[in-house]
Amino acid sequence: MDKEMRRPSKLTLGAVQLGLRYGIANRDGMPDESAAQEILEEAWQRGITSFDTAAAYGESERRIGAFVKRHPELASHLFIATKGALEPTVTLDDEAYKSALFERLEISKTALNVPEVPLYMAHRYEDYRRRLNAYTSFFGQAKDQGHIRLAGISLYTPEEAEEVLRLSRKAPLLDALQIPFNLFDRRFLENELLDKLKAAGFMLFIRSVYLQGLLFLSPDTLPSALREAAPLLRRLQSLSSETGVGLREMALGYAHERAAPDSILIGVETVTQLRENLDAYEKRLPSGLIEEIDHTFSKVPTPVLDPRKW
């Protein structure tokens, strides 16, 4: 495969669960080393060639690096995205801040066992915006020197994406964005924002397709911060029963058809979950279900949509 043409697979293995316990519906905890490698092997065998990780995800980068080390012949075919950040309290000048970003990047490259990271992202938009000059210089230099192929940011809100669009007209150094999108959260469709991001040439990754597992929880056992989600989950479960479409199938199919991203992140703790996700993705939703989902979940309270508020 020509390295210039390397792109993510339609599903990306979100590897945060491989490095730490993650997700409100996580019942299995973090897999051990053997189980993590089995998940990576199964993902590759089933056609997933892109992995998403971050320096902040515990053992995740190192475990992906162990997979790469065992399969050096696959390195040129893998699309690995990782993220880096400095502590928000860091008060270095721009040049020193850039140097610190390079140090973090080198640590990630070493952990991943790669000479070049296909996609390196700023983990927090607020950091990127606050230290724009340092990040702009860092991304440009990292690309020029062959440390990274593409640069991007992980976003939370449409407002952040709108600002990225404005900034990109002045300094078009960003290539990819990671955004939340799911059955409850369609904010990026408003004002044709998703279409604008695509038209601007951004590679788009969708995360939180299961809203960090919230879609699978019982409405009767929610923590107090998520009480507003209870009626939504009841309606979702009813819709699943009425149509005979499973929640995974519905969530993945909706994201695929409604948002049409370059790739959808899926996070798993077991090989069984991985297989269930892959099987669900291969199915397509029955006619009319997209519109019914749009109508049923047109008004979702903002606190339900943002895991940072849970």
Question: What are these regions, as identified by a protein language model?
Answer:
Residues M1-L78:
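N-terminal binding-site loop/beta-alpha segment at the start of enzyme catalytic domains
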Residues R7, F67-F79, K109-V114, Q141-K143, ...:
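Acidic (Asp/Glu)-rich catalytic clusters
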Residues L20-S34, E87-S99, R124-R129:
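Active-site mouth loops of central-metabolism enzymes
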Residues D28-E42, D94-L112, P158-L167:
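Short, acidic/polar
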Residues Q45-I48, V114-V117, I148, L174, ...:
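A structural motif
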Residues S76-T89, P180-F181:
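A short, structured active-site edge motif that brings together acidic residues
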Residues Y125-H295, V304, W310:
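Beta/alpha (TIM)-barrel catalytic core signal, keyed to glycine-rich beta->alpha loops juxtaposed to Asp/Glu
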